[in-house]
């Protein structure tokens, strides 16, 4: 039997450490029909996904995938950016396909207000978090309560790149 080299052990520990650390990344809030909430840097009202790092250390998102297609987990990939411990990151789902570190991020797809499944995948191909959104009304978000860890509920007061509100609703009804 061959000896395991210290180099191999170091690589294995780094891989395990990165996998464990990256599992603290969650989808925290989604808006799939933004008509008046907040504008992107072009002045457009675009749908968005907010992710949160629930961990105690920063996570580098380089080559992580974000997708609305279960068959294509790397439909859009993050540039070489990190998200700090307890921090939020807003990704516009605009079909503009912008992935430049230090600039607003835009996926190469838009979200469906009819509902869909959104997945974030680590560079190693591990599914970190998946959420299936229901049909969504305009300017309503679907987010976690308690923030970052709980079940998904609807919010009238959306909170892009910030902690979710404290008044959630179990369903969103169309105006009469």
Where are the language model's segments positioned?
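N-terminal signal peptide c-region/cleavage motif recognized by signal peptidases
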Residues: 16-17
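Intrinsically disordered, low-complexity linkers and terminal tails enriched in Ser/Thr/Pro/Gly
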Residues: 20-176
């Amino acid at each position: 039997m061959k000896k395991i080299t210290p180099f191999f052990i170091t690589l294995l520990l780094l891989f395990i450490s990165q996998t464990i650390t990256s599992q603290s990344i969650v989808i925290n809030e989604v808006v799939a029909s933004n008509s008046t909430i907040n504008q992107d840097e072009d002045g457009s009202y675009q749908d968005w996904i907010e992710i949160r790092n629930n961990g105690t250390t920063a996570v580098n998102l380089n080559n992580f995938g974000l997708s609305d297609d279960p068959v294509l987990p790397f439909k859009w990939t993050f540039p070489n950016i990190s998200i700090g411990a307890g921090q939020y990151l807003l990704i516009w789902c605009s079909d503009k396909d912008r992935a430049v570190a230090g600039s607003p991020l835009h996926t190469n797809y838009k979200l469906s207000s009819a509902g869909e499944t959104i997945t974030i995948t680590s560079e190693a191909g591990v599914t970190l978090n998946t959420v299936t959104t229901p049909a969504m009304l305009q300017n309503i978000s679907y987010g976690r309560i308690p923030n970052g860890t709980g079940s998904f509920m609807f919010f009238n007061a959306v909170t892009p790149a910030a902690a979710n509100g404290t008044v959630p609703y179990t369903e969103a009804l169309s105006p009469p």
